[in-house]
UniProtKB/Swiss-Prot annotation:
Organism listed in the record: Mesorhizobium japonicum (strain LMG 29417 / CECT 9101 / MAFF 303099)
GO annotation terms (biological process): regulation of glutamine family amino acid metabolic process
Organism classification: Bacteria, Pseudomonadati, Pseudomonadota, Alphaproteobacteria, Hyphomicrobiales
Enzyme nomenclature, EC number: 2.7.7.89, 2.7.7.42
Region (Adenylyl transferase): 476-986
Protein name: Bifunctional glutamine synthetase adenylyltransferase/adenylyl-removing enzyme
Renumbered residue ranges of the record's region Adenylyl removase: 1-470
Entry's family note: Belongs to the GlnE family.
Known cofactor(s): Mg(2+)
Amino acid sequence: MAAVAKRTVTDWQLKPALGLAPLDQGRARQELAEIAAAAREEGLARLAKFLAGKGAGQDFLAAVFDLSPFLRDTSRRRPRILDALFDQPVEARLEAITAAIEQAPLAETVSESSLMMELRQCKAEAHFLIALADLAGEAETSLTVRRLSDLADACTRAAVDFLLRDAHGQGKLKLPDLDNPSLQSGWILLGMGKLGAHELNFSSDIDLVVFFDPDAPAVVDRLDATELFSRLTRRLVRILQDRTEHGYVFRTDLRLRPDPGSTPLAIPVEAALRYYEARGQNWERAAMIKARPVAGDLAAGAAFLRELQPYIWRKYMDYAAIADVHSIKRQIHAHKGHGEIAVKGHNVKLGRGGIREIEFFVQTQQLIAGGRFPELRGRETVPMLGQLAARGWITADARDALARQYWFLRRVEHAVQMVADEQTHTLPEDDEGLERIAHMLGFGDAAAFSQAFRASLLQVERHYAALFETAPELSAGIGNLVFTGDVDDPNTLQTLQGLGFQRPSDICRVIRGWHFGRYRVTQSAEARERLTELTPALLKAFGQTRRADEALIRFDEFLAGLPAGIQLFSLLQSNPALLKLMATIMGAAPRLAAIITRRPHVFDGLLDPALLTELPDRVYLSARLSAFLEGDRAYEEVLDRLRIFASEQKFLIGVRLLAGSIDPARAGRAFSDLADLTIEAALQAVTAEFAARHGTIAGGVVSLLGMGKLGSRELTAGSDVDLILLYDHDADAEDSDGDKPLAPSHYYTRMTQRLISAVSAPTAEGVLYELDLRLRPSGNKGPVATHIDAFKKYQRQEAWTWEHMALSRARAIGGDTGLCAEVEAEVAAVLGQPRDAAKVKTEAADMRAMIEKEKPARDLWDIKLIPGGLIDLEFIAQVAVITGQVGAGPRATGTAEILSRLAPGFADAGARQELGAAFALYLALTQMTRLCLTGSFERDDVPPGLSDLLLAVTDLPDFGVLEAHLKETSQKVRKDFDLLLRAGRP
């Protein structure tokens, strides 16, 4: 790069920060002298004197006029533009021009021809100044594109305001405010592409999409509205782009509107919304990312875009969008000259490593994830690179490199266009032309520029290719794989056996079924083509699960349930880590495989690159849930979204456990936090819906008490949820105050039944949780909702020892904060009551003996029921709590924490360590088996992949050692149980 020139003090307000070198020094000085002469002819003595002088400013202008014929000719015709910079700096002058543009349509004597002249003169001056400031280094490229976009906005708004006032004058519209013609006019003009993103280039056309609201206050005749607004739009294009003696304002393109070949220039909003919902394509979704109301009725434009949000930002991540958008890029590459990275003749916008690749890099990821993460919905390219990096979708290196190269390439693009104000993106093919561009950018010569330009393209291409352009050989080097026809290929059978498949002929038959399009997901030719490309990698991944046949059959069942589309294959093809995870699920985790087979949308969350690094704690889950429920929603929709959210998050918590990014204890807390949040949200929805029908009870409040594994925050993937619903109200409360009043007890009983239905009823979106309310006072014989006073009385006067043991895990999970605090205090008080410790231990030991007799363990792997298993540990912890044998500190409900805090007089340090280690082992095995299996653990039918997972989570070398360790641990626990609770009793 050329050295930064030393600033010199002149009366001229533009101080060049860059020293530019002309192509020909003598010619440059001659051109400067000619412009000085033009200034003298115009009577601009101070400008003529300045141009005849010497200094950095004059050197800069001489170079500019030599390098850019467009800027030179503009200066010759209109030297007053340069002269104005003696009185105002560039920014102030641009503001004055913008103000003049805004006032132009409001002048009393304005006509269409006078407006066209005014806009062209203002635009020409602003255009010149923006270019000059850019070349001088006075403005960063980001400011240059913003200035160009603001100029286009102002010109478009001025033309629109003139046309609206004109239509008002003819009685075609009735504008509410002539000083603000666009207000409530119903005419919507959306800027698309670079205009919408405030990223306009120097000689760009502007892309507009035009809609109108026939019900807007200004519309006089709804039936004439389409013709009226289309006519106004046609005139708008003429005002902006027709070439006159004063030039043009902006070339204007309306082809991004819905179905441009058969629709009017202005489309009613309802028709547009119907089109996008029923027929909109992914490229149109991509285009709408950058859409921005730029003129006309801005409020109506914003409202229209809000209506479009569900179309642009899908509820589920959309993988098909990648292939769709990328196919456009492939078509662009098919054009001559775009296949190789070159400098001369290279298309800076569309060529390899060009601007479009950076834009597509950002846009495709926005399409995929913007529905889930609102922060990824921005219009501007570089800020979105920052957001993608912040969310972990791209590396900081990719962000910095692509942002740096984006602005560099935009500077190159501007230089190419500033030469002659032509809408071109192609570098010159001749030596002098390339030298000119190099000098405009501050390089010493074309060679230095070419080196930097080529390095930029290669850097962009490297990041872009890493995201999109993986194209493995179909055989992937693993042997013959032929699945055409209806006869098995012998070499293919051999390849499959080598990969680990036990029934290669059956596998061939399954794969041939895919290629025949027997499933909805494989019915299109493109889908089958993608699956063909993916099959070798699939077979290799499934072969590595050590139960290849079962893994592939489960994957086949998964495919059978998918809707038509190619999303999955595109995703797996471009993401080997995800393919490996999918194979692990299919080979080692039948339960998870069944979940994604029934509910394929849960697979969407696996695309989030932050999945394995972000901890699913309560704050994380709460934020995700809030975003998922945002907006005003109907009751049933809220419940459905809760079911969708819970099923997906259970799956993703499980995947984290499977991948080893969280440990079993954290998984238990995450499953429990998820249940807390979603059940409380369901309670809020039920309460509001119930109150709308039945009103409220005076002073009525509700608290949910989590029991069992929910209370102790030890839920597994397949756990039911134990709850007690408690309520309170004013002492003198009568019937509820709604249209259908209910007495208090009946009111809360009905509300609880509604909650049970909301949470546990099977629906198209599945079940939120299976609820169990049997731990409430009097169990199934008691009412489903319990008044707080009745709860207190029961716990203090009637509850059995086992009920107080169960209460030791109780935790308020939702509802009114005041009542929750009261419930927590009451639970603590009940647990702290004096008890006969010997009697409690005896009753607990007898209870355990009865369970052992009536429900003996099936085998060693029945971890809950085996002697010395989970129940033994839980009973020890619960007895310690209700007999006051837990160390000082906040009340604990988790078994692990209670065992670690057993009082020294109850259990010595050795026993505490032994019991804690046993619980950690049991928790790890239980979490993993409940995650992977739907039924019980069958020792002789364990998927090898699950065996590997169990060894990984317990850090043991082989399955035999694991079983020996499990047996030894249970024997130690039973010994401790006998010592602590049986106290030597036989």
